Amino acid sequence: MPLKLVPSKPEEVPLMVETYFEAFSQDPIHQRFAPRGTQSARDFWTTSLSAEIRDENNHFLSVWDDSSTPETFVGFAKWIVPGASPEALPPADQWPSEGDQQFSVFFFGRLGEMHHEAMGKRPHWYLELVAVKPQYQGKGAASLMLKYGVNKADEDKVECFLDASPAGQPIYERYGFRVVQRDTFLDGTYVQCAMVRDARV
């Protein structure tokens, strides 16, 4: 399948938002904080991505299937460059109102703690988000976006970091990531992993 990796453009944000909802429609965490089909969740992601894609510290990537006419948007990823900090988490009342705002603050705050505990102040490339449409999952789109970041990290001779559910672990492990920390959520039914890829020096 001919997939094409390109830098994302601001005008692709609506496609990115829809892809996010499709990719995470079965994920209980994402459905709890940003329920699919709700206007507040759509507005939250549209506003967030529209701002973040204009920040030069964020490398947004898009994958397209150019075998179709017109081309089909397949997925996107966000890598954050070494030395840059992720955007500050919003207060509870700025998370999607139709989701669980207090849980959102708790969950994403905990992910931030795990990130800091794993990496401290060491420079690294951070894969903050990757989303691929369900019909394209397992067909190489995520690998294209992963390769971009790990190649950048190898050029810079620094580590990579990401957090993942167990479902995502196998592909990340193929690219040299290893689990350094785990935490459980939703009464122990959901496991989130902090994963690190060592620097290639």
Predicted regions and their residues:
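A short beta-loop-alpha structural element at the N-terminal edge
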Residues: 4-18
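Conserved GNAT acetyl-CoA-binding A-motif
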Residues: 123-126, 152-164
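Conserved acetyl-CoA-binding loop-helix of GNAT-fold acetyltransferases
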Residues: 132, 138-151
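C-terminal "cap" of GNAT-fold acetyltransferases
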Residues: 162-169, 185-201
